Design a protein with these regions (language model features):
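Conserved alpha-helix/loop element of class I SAM-dependent methyltransferases that forms part
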Residues: 26-63, 77, 81
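Class I SAM-dependent methyltransferase SAM/SAH-binding core
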Residues: 59, 63-67, 75-129
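A short acidic, Gly/Pro-enriched loop at the edge of an enzyme's catalytic core
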Residues: 130-141
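A short SAM/SAH-binding and catalytic strip from SAM-dependent methyltransferases
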Residues: 140-153
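A short glycine-rich, Lys/Arg-flanked "PGG" loop and its adjoining helix->strand segment in the class I
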Residues: 155-170
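Short, glycine-/aromatic-enriched active-site segment of Class I SAM-dependent methyltransferases
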Residues: 177-197
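Short alpha-helix
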Residues: 199-214
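C-terminal lobe and adjacent flexible extensions of AdoMet/dcAdoMet transferase-like proteins
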Residues: 213, 219-224, 230-347
Length: 347
């Protein structure tokens, strides 16, 4: 299937208008990102096929790896956010996409006013990151945008992500997931695979895979149900539903399989740039500035052992266990709004 994907994204697709479904539609970006997105080269934006926004908080000076970087849209957006002294590396297997990305490297360096470009692009497979010149425990953040579903060896990808992340780093990525396991007759369809549907993991299989790969507590940031909007493909899919979802997986030792209550709390100082009033860790943890916010042990560690630590006051310790943290459940996690993309633009 790898060759079919290379052909689909290298030869058949020339812009997002060529896609046959709406799987590659972004959420509306926050206001502070819109001026940066407007500065990106038109060709880079036109050849972008992501399904979410992969720009987490607090990126200045960070080292970031983008898996399946394509035309470089996310790489160049993050290039502006990390600043001249940060670094962004893109990995992609498609020559045509890499050519677009590299062709506009000087353009973005000059646009952002940098003396030297802070990005580089490597040709390679995301299942074979060990064959690239990438140092273990080097990256603060690894991102991916609607690419993991295309991989033929997802466990290997997650193992390599774990290896390449610094302690306290995170894998912050958007992808497509299914509400049930995709049957073989759909999984082997090249068009459905290229459209990011056939290779999508059943959501609970993904959670189990993440935990088996060393990411004990995957956190869902945002999600939306995909409305395929292609009658022929909808008829073939039947009752199968797909979702675009953004997860963050922290590379932190000591995270537990469930949310445990140790009587802890945090107070957000309001000091993360662009987030003066509240800090959003995930879709269940929006922490208002100055308010004592009770947290489970895992949330405590995600904040205290990551780049966010200096922006919080931490109350309590792990001395006494009070049982499971209230509200820790295993229901279908995604938003199931039939409104689709809520008017967000396709890209």
């Amino acid at each position: 299937m790898r060759e079919e994907v290379q052909n689909y994204y290298g030869q058949q697709l020339h812009s997002s208008d060529d896609l046959q479904t709406n799987a590659c539609c972004d959420q509306e970006p926050p206001a502070y990102l819109k001026p940066l997105l407007a500065q990106l080269h038109d060709e880079v934006v036109m050849r972008y096929y992501g399904c979410g926004l992969v720009a987490p908080q607090l990126l200045k000076g960070m080292r970031i790896l983008d898996l399946g970087s394509g035309s470089g849209r996310d790489v160049y957006l993050l290039s502006a956010l990390v600043g001249e002294h940060g670094e962004v590396v893109g990995v992609d297997m498609t020559d045509e996409q890499l050519e677009v990305a590299r062709r506009h490297q000087d353009y973005h360096r000059d646009t952002f006013g940098y003396v030297k470009s802070n990005v580089r692009f490597l040709k390679g497979y995301i299942e074979e990151l060990d064959k690239l010149d990438l140092e273990d425990s080097y990256f603060d953040i690894i991102i991916s945008n609607c690419v993991i579903n295309l991989s033929t060896d997802k466990p290997k990808v997650l193992r390599d992500v774990k290896r390449l992340l610094k302690p306290g780093g995170e894998f912050y990525f958007s992808d497509v997931y299914a509400d049930r396991r995709v049957p073989d007759n759909l999984r082997n369809d090249p068009v459905l695979y290229g459209e990011c549907l056939a290779g999508a993991l059943y959501w609970n299989d993904f959670l189990n895979l993440a935990k088996q790969s060393g990411f004990a507590d995957p956190r869902l940031v945002e999600s939306r149900r995909l409305t395929i909007e292609n009658p022929d493909i909808e008829a073939r899919l039947g009752r199968q539903r797909f979702y675009s979802a953004t997860y963050r997986l922290f590379n932190i030792d000591g995270l537990e399989p469930a949310c445990e209550d140790y009587g802890q709390a945090v107070v957000y100082k309001g000091t993360v740039d662009q987030h003066p009033h509240a800090f959003s860790l995930d879709d269940h943890h929006v922490i208002e500035t100055g308010k004592v916010f009770p947290v489970c042990g895992n949330t405590w560690l995600m904040l205290e052992k990551s780049r966010f630590a200096e922006h919080f006051t931490f109350i309590g310790n792990f001395d006494t266990h009070y049982g499971i943290f209230e509200g820790c459940g295993l229901n279908v996690p995604f938003e199931d709004n039939d409104a689709g993309n809520d008017g967000a633009p396709c890209c």
